[in-house]
């Protein structure tokens, strides 16, 4: 093709079936701009109760914005004192837990007799920390103790008979479970005449409690313990407290950083005892942490940060979890129990590398699963069901969560191995995924879980049937509104009021977690001073908002799509959480974007003439080869005709991809690239779904 032929490159055939277009436009709109439409959210601004707010201001002396946040969390004046000022002295008596006396007596008797004890744990962070805590404590008590954690893929969660038989044959006298065991009635019954078992667990108790020597679980019937929110490591900590109190006459307060790590990671409500434990544990983590945790902080690049619950949940816990997902969780336990600096450094680095491996496996499966949704025609399904051969079963739950974030539909991700699919499910607010699976139990091999997350296995030949059954189930059980995620806004703020002082005042509510969620604020009208992609892969977005005194940065992780419809000079509304940004000694407020929308959305309209102009820009940017998607998008926005808005100009890339002019690929670093393809002859624009959809807006609206 000659250089000057590009003006005549496109043919615009207008013989369009408008009725079909009207029917299809919604589906194609989802296909072409899937990230955009799936990110649309409903804002719910929580109503105020100024009378309650004023009571808190008067009786607790808190800032008005803090009072409003406390009212939103149903915290009154009495509870407010404990919430804001609770200390370790307020922890409950561990002996009020049912069977604690029996457990303490049996453990002390076993230690005195120098008999062997095995701590039987679990491979998630709650189980890892509970195992580490109790093992360290029993060593301190002079016990002969070892630990056992089942392998995720071959053994699965909880007690298994084969493992217990090995433990018995090795001569153990007592098994103490942590974070598991409450549902293992048959297994405990099979071995309880040959070995003593103490169960410590926090999961919901079934009707039949296992016949162990002692069962410590605050959720079992007739347990008078008033705090029902402890994690698995929290229950193990209460056992340590009781033993130390009986032996030494004082509270056991060591290893609180380990307890905090598991408590945050298990996403239990951070209220009551959990809040006190996590506050104290974070203090220790920042002042004199466990050696293994300290080395984990180093490899995670957090050594110069004040560690928060957020750092635990999003940075430290995933590195410990990676061991159980990709290799074996015992390595994570070794990190937390060692006193050898060199060994701790070695294991921490191993976990860092294992986590990177987990991320790569997850990224690969996520990309394949995401592509399956689009290419197999399931974008408009009521439920997302994707399957792949030999997907790593240790990460499919994470992939399911990511797909829920993108498409906001109940999601099942299935790994097929030797004709059998092992699935992991994640749900949306208000939809019970466990009940959905139960409606299909006749075609499942097995299943289990709860309302928000579940797992199952199925013959691979029945996956399509499962998709159909769940689709029909969701048609009845899920309303259209439930497919739109809701952002609950605690309070609205003028953008000019956002400063470091308000961040400091709001931090009185930390640590955040389930039951005390991170406050979300809303700015209803702010002007975009600038927008840019950031990160090595250009997969994060920074939006700079104008303020009366300058500007404030707003960050959106994993939202490169914002670059396509938020532009300089726009007025936007933003839902966000607040945090400090500390850089080279300078401290400033920073908004973490939860949602952002233009006040006035720019209509997307495409024309053959406009595409010809963008075609020239793209061709020059690629120079017959390849370049980063970010660079090409920047060139389009910089050089586009003034009569085209940014959204329409960037949408041209989707048209070009559908016509085969360009293709998208990923380089060795994982960065999105655009490659120029040599195409001979004329191109028919009506073969582009995107062009048909957006060149006929007036017809289909």
What are these model-predicted stretches?
Residues 139, 144, 275-318, 322-370, ...:
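Acidic, two-metal ion nucleic-acid-processing modules in DNA metabolism proteins
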Residues 109, 204-217, 375, 545-550:
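Acidic-glycine-rich active-site phosphate/pyrophosphate-binding loop
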Residues 37-39, 46-174, 194, 244-463, ...:
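Hydrophobic helix-and-loop "lid/oligomerization" segment in the mid-to-C-terminal part
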Residues 22-37:
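Short, Lys/Arg-enriched N-terminal segments with co-localized hydrophobic residues
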């Amino acid at each position: 093709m000659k250089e000057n032929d590009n003006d005549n490159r496109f043919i615009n055939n207008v013989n369009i079936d408008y009725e079909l277009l009207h029917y299809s436009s919604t589906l194609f709109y989802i296909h072409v701009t899937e990230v955009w439409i799936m990110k649309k959210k409903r804002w719910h601004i929580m109503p105020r109760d100024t009378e309650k707010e004023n009571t808190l201001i008067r009786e607790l002396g808190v800032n008005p914005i803090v009072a409003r946040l406390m009212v939103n969390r149903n915290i009154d004046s009495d509870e407010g004192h404990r919430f804001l000022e609770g200390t370790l002295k307020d922890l409950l008596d561990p002996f009020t837990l049912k069977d604690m006396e029996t457990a303490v007596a049996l453990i002390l008797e076993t230690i005195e007799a120098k008999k062997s004890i095995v701590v039987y744990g679990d491979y998630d962070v709650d189980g890892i920390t509970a195992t580490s805590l109790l093992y360290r404590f029993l060593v301190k008590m002079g016990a002969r103790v070892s630990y056992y954690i089942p392998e995720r893929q071959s053994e699965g969660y909880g007690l298994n008979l084969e493992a217990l038989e090995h433990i018995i044959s090795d001569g153990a006298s007592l098994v103490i479970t942590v974070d598991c065991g409450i549902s293992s009635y048959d297994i405990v019954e099979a071995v309880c005449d040959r070995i003593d078992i103490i169960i410590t667990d926090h999961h919901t108790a079934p009707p039949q409690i296992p016949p162990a020597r002692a069962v410590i679980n605050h959720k079992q019937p007739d347990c008078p313990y008033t705090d029902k929110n402890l994690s698995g490591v929290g229950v193990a900590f209460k056992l340590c407290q009781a033993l130390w109190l009986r032996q030494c006459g004082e509270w056991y307060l060591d290893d609180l950083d380990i307890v905090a790590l598991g408590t945050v990671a298990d996403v239990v409500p951070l209220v009551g005892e959990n809040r006190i434990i996590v506050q104290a544990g974070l203090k220790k983590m920042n002042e004199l942490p466990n050696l293994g945790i300290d080395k984990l902080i180093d490899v995670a690049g957090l050594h110069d940060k004040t560690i928060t619950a957020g750092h635990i949940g999003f940075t430290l816990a995933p590195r410990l979890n990676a061991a159980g997902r990709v290799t074996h969780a015992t390595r994570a336990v070794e990190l937390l129990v060692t006193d050898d600096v060199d060994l701790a450094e070695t294991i921490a680095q191993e976990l860092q590398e294992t986590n990177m491996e987990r991320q790569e496996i997850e990224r690969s499966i996520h990309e394949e699963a995401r592509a399956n949704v689009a290419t197999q025609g399931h974008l408009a399904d009521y439920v997302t069901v994707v399957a792949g051969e030999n997907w790593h079963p240790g990460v499919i739950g994470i992939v399911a969560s990511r797909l829920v974030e993108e498409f906001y539909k109940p999601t099942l991700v299935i790994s097929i191995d030797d004709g059998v699919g092992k699935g992991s499910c994640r749900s949306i607010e208000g939809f019970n995924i466990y009940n959905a699976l139960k409606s299909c139990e006749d075609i499942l091999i097995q299943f289990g879980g709860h309302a928000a997350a579940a797992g199952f296995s199925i013959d691979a030949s029945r996956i399509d049937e499962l998709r159909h059954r769940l689709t029909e189930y969701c048609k009845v059980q899920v309303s259209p509104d439930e497919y739109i995620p809701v952002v609950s806004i605690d309070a609205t703020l003028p953008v000019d009021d956002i400063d470091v002082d308000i961040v400091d005042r709001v931090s009185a509510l930390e640590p955040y977690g389930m039951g005390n969620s991170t406050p979300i604020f809303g700015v209803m009208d702010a002007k975009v001073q600038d927008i840019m992609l950031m990160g090595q892969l250009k997969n994060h977005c920074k939006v700079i908002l104008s303020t009366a005194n300058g500007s404030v940065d707003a960050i959106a992780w994993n939202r490169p799509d914002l670059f396509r419809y938020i532009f300089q000079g726009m007025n936007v509304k933003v839902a966000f959480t607040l945090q400090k940004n500390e850089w080279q000694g300078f401290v400033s407020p920073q908004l973490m974007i939860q949602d952002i929308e233009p006040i006035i959305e720019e209509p997307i309209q495409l024309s053959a003439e406009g595409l010809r102009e963008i075609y020239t820009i793209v061709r020059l940017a690629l120079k017959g080869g390849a370049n980063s998607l970010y660079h090409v998008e920047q060139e389009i926005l910089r050089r586009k005709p003034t009569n085209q808005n940014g959204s329409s100009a960037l949408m041209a890339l989707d048209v070009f991809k559908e016509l085969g002019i360009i293709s998208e690929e990923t380089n060795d670093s994982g960065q999105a690239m655009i490659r120029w393809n040599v195409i001979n002859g004329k191109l028919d624009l009506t073969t582009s779904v995107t062009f048909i959809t957006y060149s006929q807006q007036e017809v289909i609206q």
